[in-house]
Amino acid sequence: MHRGRSASARQERDFRALMDLAHGFMASQVLFAGCALRVFDAAALGPVDAAALARSSGLSPRGTRLLLDACAGLGLLRRRRGAGPRGPAYTNSPLASTFLVAGSPLSQRSLLLYLAGTTYLCWGHLADGVREGRSQYARAVGVDADDPFTAIYRSEAERLLFMRGLQETWSLCGGRVLAAFDLSPFRVICDLGGGSGALARMAARLYPGSEVTVFETPDVVAAARAHFPPPADEDGAEPRVRFLSGDFFRSPLPPADLYVLARVLHDWADAACVELLRRVRGALRPGGAVLLVESVLSPGGAGPTRTLLLSLTMLLQARGRERTEAEYRALTARAGFSRLRLRRPRGPYHAMMAARGGGAGARSDGGGGEATSQTGSGTGREVGAQD
């Protein structure tokens, strides 16, 4: 009897765990819908009830009440028992106030909307991706493109959403990865595929003696100029960041003392990573280095789970995968770099630095580029923007 009861209790626990996994997509959609319908923006102004929110937002009263209750059940809202026909009132939880309200300094709303409109749709075709070993943009969003960024940038609105999502990511963890190593000895820093310039501006603030350049595609730089004005520092000064337009696989790369590749290599297969690293090494001055920012797998590749899931995102949306420290060391060594070091600051992303080295392995592809002196930026060559 004791064994039977133990087995039954274990089965019940396992079944609950199974159902939590099976229904996990529902929780994601509650979060995404709450952001898309600006539920958390409304609750930031004061307690809301379902009927009033439905009227002001053009929503169905029944659907609104069900969504608000689900948000409360997930800990996104707090539900206050109400008296009378208005029913309960809802307020934001601390999590929602910090990360889900559009005006919050640490808001992740754009990132979540990008995940909902692109990444989530690709994940609906995971079995196809595993069978075929390729991205699933054609099935998910109707864009069959060899370059994954053609699908991500399928409209100007999607481009801007992606750029904002990356900017939000760096608002949380950019400073930590930039401070993982002392970058002050590097006078000229180039952020390759530097997005809206958020990480580059952080580098300019942390290391005011350095000149920081963002190398980005022309269309992204144009979008940054129009939509991402640089924030002023406390003293009113704007962090100075220069921009160069080009394609980092084809265009000459500017000379620099340090290249930053933040969440870039995981987009690409090994051969493309080595090619890009060789180009970077050829543009580095003597004594230079490369700083890689990635979510690094544990030795043997058994975890963490979040990084394993992100690796599947690379299957569905790009050509690469997440890697272990040893795999990044092998890639950098093939490109001619030496002495890769790994730092694990608090947060989901890790910092690795490798020295330029003096041996063979580099093709000298550095040089000019189309320079534009601008205190704005473009969007990076990074696909799975999850935090």
Swiss-Prot record:
Keyword Lipid metabolism: yes
Residue numbers spanned by region Disordered: 355-387
Keyword field contains Zinc-finger: no
Catalytic reaction(s) noted: N-acetylserotonin + S-adenosyl-L-methionine = melatonin + S-adenosyl-L-homocysteine + H(+)
Biological process annotations from GO: lipid metabolic process; melatonin biosynthetic process; methylation
Protein keywords: Lipid metabolism, Melatonin biosynthesis, Methyltransferase, S-adenosyl-L-methionine, Transferase
Binding-site list for S-adenosyl-L-methionine: 153, 170, 216, 246-248, 263
Pathway info: Aromatic compound metabolism; melatonin biosynthesis; melatonin from serotonin: step 1/2
Residues annotated as binding substrate: 267, 317
GO MF: acetylserotonin O-methyltransferase activity; protein dimerization activity
Catalytic center residues: 266 (proton donor/acceptor)
EC number, UniProt record: 2.1.1.4
Biased composition (Gly residues): 356-370
Pfam hit, one: Dimerisation
Subunit structure: Homodimer.
Protein function: Catalyzes the transfer of a methyl group onto N-acetylserotonin, producing melatonin (N-acetyl-5-methoxytryptamine).
Family as reported in the entry's similarity comment: Belongs to the class I-like SAM-binding methyltransferase superfamily. Cation-independent O-methyltransferase family.
Name the UniProt record assigns to this protein: Acetylserotonin O-methyltransferase
Species this protein is from: Mus musculus molossinus (Japanese house mouse)
Organism ancestry: Eukaryota, Metazoa, Chordata, Craniata, Vertebrata
